[in-house]
Amino acid sequence: MSGNAALNRPLGGFDATMAGIGSIVGAGVFVVFPAAVAADGGGLAVPLLIAAVVAYACGVSIFQVSAALDADQANYDDGGTRAARLLLGPTAAFVTGWVFLCSRLAASAVAALMLGTYLLPDFAVPVAVGAVVLTAVLNIFGITRSDWVSRFIVAFVIAVLAFVAVAAFNSGHPPGSVKLATLPEPGLAGILESAALLYFAFIGYGYLASLGPHVRSPARNIPLALPAALAVVLGLYLLVGQSLLSYFGAPALAAEAAPVLGPVSQVSGSIGTGAVLIAAAAAGLGVLSALNAGCARVASAMSDEGELPSVFGRTRAALKGRPETHWAGITAGAAVVVVLVAAFPPGTLLGVAAFFGLLYAGATAVTAFSLRSRRWYTPRVLNLLGLAGALLLALSLPLLVISLGLMAIVAGAVVRLTFRRGR
């Protein structure tokens, strides 16, 4: 979930696939496997496959919605909101935008706590808060990563994950005594909950699906790049997940807070541990920066439509010579993430992020279903599959997660009634 908001040159099919892989592989892979194993009792292959299928179906919907917009409107951050307004009306647009904001704010909190848990587990919350503040300040000053830096980080993270998998398959078991979790009996409900949580690790697929204006021949390249990227990431996740299961065993993996560290802890000279920590920090900071800026852009678009206070639509340069940024949205988003980090444990935040990510995917599928013009590879049945899959997985999450999600939606309704302009 760490793609750049803009690209400097049109991409071919291979480059688009690589950009998609980079946007998907992020902070989620460092934290999602313990929660997924705890949900279904141990298996990862079937839930991962379900999550990937739902991601593909919903990705096609995002591609359709993006293709229906003008080039300057077809972006990942607020493209779904703009399309919903054009096709379904202002209420649908607000719901889509609000759900997007909730999803990305919760995902930011997960990424921040992941970073803190890996770097300084005894001070995870303070480190997470510091990371949120740091990335917000950088965004306010308009300091972003170049394309080549982003690609290097993605390549490094993937290489580290592959190294972890090899180390896990070739190691014994964790040294000393380990904490064991009590696992549920395997069943359909557990598989669906596990798939919903694992979906969080695929959420960045939407960035690739909305890359149309930045890709040569998007009608040909994106429908090929999307399944290719998801297939590569699915293979990577299967490799890493199965290797962690082999190393820890299901009960120990379910209780592990920083699972990717375990298999490399015995590598001589702490080289493996250092590489994992650097990868976790790079992935976490990259996700925080991208999501913070993305939420600010969505808030700005909603403000322009009169759905949020006008302050979110204003831009200002922090210093003379620096680019103008959506300072209010960046600041407000960071403040919300800090509250989430301080108030909720990582597992709850992961569930909430997955819940809202699935709701956003479902909302986009509804928007795509309403489109009349479509190609042979975007049938309405695929939109229905995405909608049904997203709702089924969302409702399979724990009652606490669903309750928190519904409370946030009610809060959104209050915000709209209070601040809506131009009625």
At which residue positions do the language-model features occur?
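Hydrophobic transmembrane alpha-helices that form the core helical bundles
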Residues: 56-132, 137-140, 280-301, 339-363
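Alpha-helical transmembrane segments
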Residues: 308-316, 362-378
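Small-residue-rich segments of transmembrane alpha-helices in multi-pass membrane proteins
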Residues: 19-28, 87, 154-168, 228-237, ...
